[in-house]
Structure formats: C-alpha cells, structure tokens
From Swiss-Prot:
Note accompanying the cofactor annotation: Binds 1 [2Fe-2S] cluster per subunit. This cluster acts as a Lewis acid cofactor.
Similarity annotation: Belongs to the IlvD/Edd family.
Active site: S473 (proton acceptor)
Pathway membership: Amino-acid biosynthesis; L-isoleucine biosynthesis; L-isoleucine from 2-oxobutanoate: step 3/4; Amino-acid biosynthesis; L-valine biosynthesis; L-valine from pyruvate: step 3/4
Source species: Chlorobium luteolum (strain DSM 273 / BCRC 81028 / 2530)
Protein name per Swiss-Prot or TrEMBL: Dihydroxy-acid dehydratase
Organism placement in taxonomy: Bacteria, Pseudomonadati, Chlorobiota, Chlorobiia, Chlorobiales
Length: 565
C-alpha cells in the first residue's frame, strides 16, 4: 500500500505517533488497512456545499465498516452565484486549479491509498477530477446532489436564473419590488447545487458517463434519502477499487471522454463543461482537440431540455424520468455513438450500468426519433472573429437568433456592458461584445450571467446576441457566444472590433464573422497598445501569467523549468 510509506517499520514511529494523535487510529490493526482520504468540500458559503459535512460523516463511517481508515480533509470552493457580477467572479475559474493542486498536495503528502471525493458545485468537481487523474490513485466521486426547484405562492416554478432575470424586469418596471422579493424568497428553497442543467449539475451528470461516479450521482436530490445511500455505496466501493488498484486513468479513456461529450450534447449541458472536460483530458494525457466537438455534436440528438433552456423541467424531473442512465440508454440505440464497453467505478462496464434503465417520462427525455433537434445542444463556432473557436449552448437559443446579423456594441469590461444594457444603450438587433474578460484579460474568464440576464429581463432575448472572450454561467440562455479564442488580451481578432461593425452569426453553419477585411483587422491589431494586466499581485496575477486559452481548457501552462528536455 502507498500508505505503508508513513506507517510501516520502526523508522515510522514518529509518523504513527502523529497519526495516533489525530484520534483517527483506533488500534494497531488500523496500520494494516488502506488509508482513504475523504476529500470533502463542505463550507457554509455555498448552498450546494452547506450539507456536505453530514455526507462526509457518512462516508467515514462506511469506509471504516468496509475495512479502511478514513481521513477527512476539505478543499476550498467558490459559489459562482454569490461571486457573480463583481471582482469575486475572477476567482471562480481560477479556483479550479487551486482545488486540483490542494487535493494533489494532501493525497501525495500523506500517501493516501484512495479517495472518496465529495464535490458539488461548479469548479469543485472538475478541480477534484483533475487532481485524481494527476495523482492517479483509486478514486470515486459522489456529489452533494441538486437543489429542488422553487415555487412561488401562485405556483410558478422558479430557480436562481429567475431571480437574475427578475432584476432586469425590475429595472424596466415590468415587475414590482414586491414581485421581485417573492421570486427571491422562493427560488432557492434549500441546499444543493442550483436546480437546472447549470455547470454544477452538468459536471455531476458527466461524472456518471466518465465512469467516475455511481448511477444517480447527477440527479438524486440533495435532500433525498437515496443521496445518503449513494454515499454509503460509494464509500464501500472505494475499498474494492483500492484492493484491485483500479485507478482513474484505467477508467478515463478517449472513448469514455467521447461518451461524456455525447451525453453533454444530448442534455444541453453548460458551455463550461467543454472547458472543464478539456482540462480533465489534459490531466489524463489524452489526445483530444477542441475542433472534434462539432463532428460529435452533429450525430448526437438533443433529447433532454432542462432549465435554463426551459423553465418546465429541472434536474429533479430528469431524475424522476429515469436519470442519466435513461438518457445514455436512449443514446445507446444510435449505432456507434457510445462505447458501452468502457469500465466504471461500479466494477461493471457502462453498458452493464445502463442496460436496465428506462425512460419513465417522454416529455422530459425524448426518444432519438423525436428529439428537440437532430444535433446536440452545444457547438463550436469558427470564423474571423474566433479563429480558434467559440462556444454556444444552441439548446438555449430561440429560433429567431439561430441566424443573426447586426451592429456591434463593444464594451471592454463586463461592468461597462451591464451599465450599458441596464441604461438602455442596447437595442433590438445589436450584437453586444464584451472583451478583455478572457482567461488572461479578466483575469479568470468571469461568467456573464448578469448581462445575459439583463438582456433577457429587458425583453431583448430574441433580438440581441452577446459575444465574449469570457464565459457564461450554466444558467445563461439566449444567443450567448463565449470562450472566443484567441482572447482580446493576446490581441485576438475580437480586440479589433469597433462599434458599428457588422457581426454575423450562423449557428447552423457553425460560423461567427465580422464584416471587416483581413487587412483591416491586421491594421487595427497592429495599432493596439500592449495589454496592461488589471491585477498585479496575489494569486490572480500569477494565474493570469500562466493560464492558456479557452480552447485548450484554460489550463495552466507548465513552467519552462519543469518541461522535459
């Protein structure tokens, strides 16, 4: 066992003395057992994590029953909703790398034999997953579960996005202060990851397809007794995974990655999933290119439409309809789309996991013969505005905006854009451009939920597009095109755009262009001053110096001194 490094032999007497002092060692026989890290992310700032302390307790109890010695430790976490619209959002994506590094540090420093990872919200799941693949010791994931959708006294279904959009409605006088307060009070009824197919739930669903989590991980509600049982089962499974030395890189193959992307496209997951899955693939040293996504999307039908694409369906409805296993089972009917032979943490193949799944509600999970669209709910656009690509959640775009051409309304920061939108400077037909908000420019590639919600709340969702080198919340809807690469801070073409330039978006044609000649773009770029970093000290300054482009997952580049020669 790896943990023998810190517990076996007379030389390790000091180590054992310290371990005993933790109160976790119950006797000498514990030194013969695997040491299992319970990698929790409990904190009281994130509603999706406020209940995880109890799940950690259950995991420790079950690991000990199964023959292991549990050691719980925590990672940090950022609530994207609370961090939204201010400097805090610049720390959100950057926290993914901190989480990965911290999990790596604890597991390696203490020679843990395996991990039970308990994430839930946006950057915590991919951060833990990146660490798992980096250290490559047996790991199983079990998330905290989704929040229930809210309901107003009148019976209207609401969620967090309803509140953001209600702010825009309040700014126009469409709703009263009292109506806004009613939505605010009822949108988030309890703990759990926000209730739609936003980033957190998207990643927890993808964990099933990747093979790292048990069936049900993505959809069983936080308050459901089945969630506690899922934690118990996962905590028992880790002992078997350790004994058989089944490691993350044994599970995550290129085929498993393609399975996850197919699921992502079929359920219209958050655009952030592409960013995170590319980063995960990088840690696994898998050869996968951003440009491959459109080919897979073209053969994957969009069969499960969930909030924010529609307010009629939330994650709890997907669970009642059969969950992720039912979606995968439906997709398995398409010859060659899924590789059902890939292994999973259940000890069975993906095909064995889903063979008995069935769709229980065709209004929630459609058949492959009757999809919302024949192609997936996410795609990549290319053109002279985004030579290295840009991402859009097609499943949340209204029909009138699938093709759009209009004058650019350019803002060099999210704050300026919000002020412009709320101040009435954006009109029907415009293309709002928010730049210098990419991985380096932001820094941290902040999400644009506030401006997109303002556009929707002001009734412009069917007539205004938004383009950015930043990101979007999984809760954004409308013609929201993000991850524009290269970003403005490295003098990508988006930096050349000027107010009034015509921008043309053709989503079915997968293109995004500005009606400016290549020569004019080059001249404008040549005349730009050098980008001045917005933050010059602390973690974000270091992050901005090392982060790479969105089309490679916004991972941190390896310092030159660490590169193999």
């Amino acid at each position: 066992m790896r943990s023998d490094t810190i517990k076996t032999g007379f030389e390790k007497a000091p180590h054992r003395s310290l371990l005993k002092a933790t109160g976790t060692i119950h006797g000498k026989s514990d030194y013969q057992k695997p040491f299992i890290g319970i990698c929790n992310s409990f904190n009281e700032l994130i509603p999706g994590h406020a209940h995880l302390q109890e799940l950690g307790r259950i995991a420790k109890e079950e690991v000990r029953k199964a023959g292991g010695v549990p050691f719980e430790f925590n990672t940090i976490g950022v609530c994207d909703g609370i961090a939204m619209g201010h400097i805090g959002m610049r720390y959100s994506l950057a926290s993914r790398e901190l989480i990965a590094d911290s999990v790596e540090t604890v597991a390696e420093a203490h020679r843990l034999d395996g991990l039970v990872c308990i994430p839930n919200c946006d950057k915590i799941t991919p951060g833990m997953m990146m660490a798992a693949l980096r250290i490559n010791i047996p790991v199983i994931f079990v998330s905290g579960g989704p929040m229930k959708a809210g309901h107003t006294p009148s019976g209207k279904t609401v969620d967090l996005i309803s509140v953001f959009e209600a702010v825009g409605q309040r700014s126009t006088g469409e709703i009263s202060e009292e109506e806004l307060e009613t939505i605010e009070e009822n949108a988030c009824p309890g703990c759990g990851s926000c209730s739609g197919m936003f980033t957190a739930n998207s990643m927890n669903c993808l964990s099933e397809a990747l093979g790292f989590a048990l069936p049900g991980n993505g959809t069983i509600l936080a308050g459901d007794p089945r969630r506690n049982e899922l934690v118990r089962e996962a905590s028992r499974r880790i002992i078997d995974l350790v004994e058989k030395n089944v490691r993350p890189r044994d599970i995550l193959s290129r085929s498993a990655l393609l399975n996850a992307f197919a699921l992502d496209f079929a359920m219209g997951g958050s655009t952030n999933t592409i960013l995170h899955t590319l980063a995960i693939a990088n840690e696994a040293e898998l050869d996968f290119d951003f440009s491959e996504l459109n080919g897979l999307s073209a053969k994957t039908p969009y069969i499960c439409k969930v909030s924010p694409a529609t307010m009629d369906v939330h994650i709890e409805d997907v669970d009642r309809a059969g969950g992720i296993s039912a979606i995968l089972h439906e997709l398995s009917k398409i010859d060659g789309l899924l590789d059902l032979s890939v292994p999973t943490v259940t000890g069975k193949s993906l095909g064995e996991n889903i063979k008995n799944a069935e769709v229980l509600n065709r209004k929630v999970i459609r058949s492959i013969e009757d999809p919302y669209s024949a192609t997936g709910g996410l795609c990549v656009l290319y053109g002279n505005l985004a030579p290295q690509g840009a991402v859009i959640k097609t499943g949340a775009v209204s029909a009138p905006m699938m093709h759009h051409s209009g004058p650019a309304k350019v803002y060099d920061s999210q704050d300026d854009a919000i002020a412009g939108i709320m101040g009435g400077d954006v009109h029907s037909g415009d293309v709002v451009v928010i730049r210098y908000e990419g991985p380096k420019g932001g820094p941290g590639m902040p999400e644009m939920l506030s401006p997109t919600s303002a556009i929707m709340g002001r009734g412009l969702g069917d007539s205004v597009a938004l383009i950015t080198d930043g990101r979007f919340s999984g809760g954004s809807r409308g013609a929201c095109i993000g991850h524009v690469s290269p970003e403005a801070a490295v003098k990508g073409p988006i930096a050349a755009l000027r107010n009034g330039d015509t921008v043309t978006i053709d989503i079915p044609g997968r293109s995004i262009t500005m009606e400016v000649s290549d020569e004019e773009i080059a001249d404008r770029i040549a005349g730009l001053p050098a980008f001045v970093p917005k933050i010059r000290k602390g973690y974000l300054a270091r992050y901005a110096e090392m982060v790479t482009s969105a089309n490679t997952g916004a991972i941190l580049k390896t310092p030159v001194s660490c590169e193999p020669k």
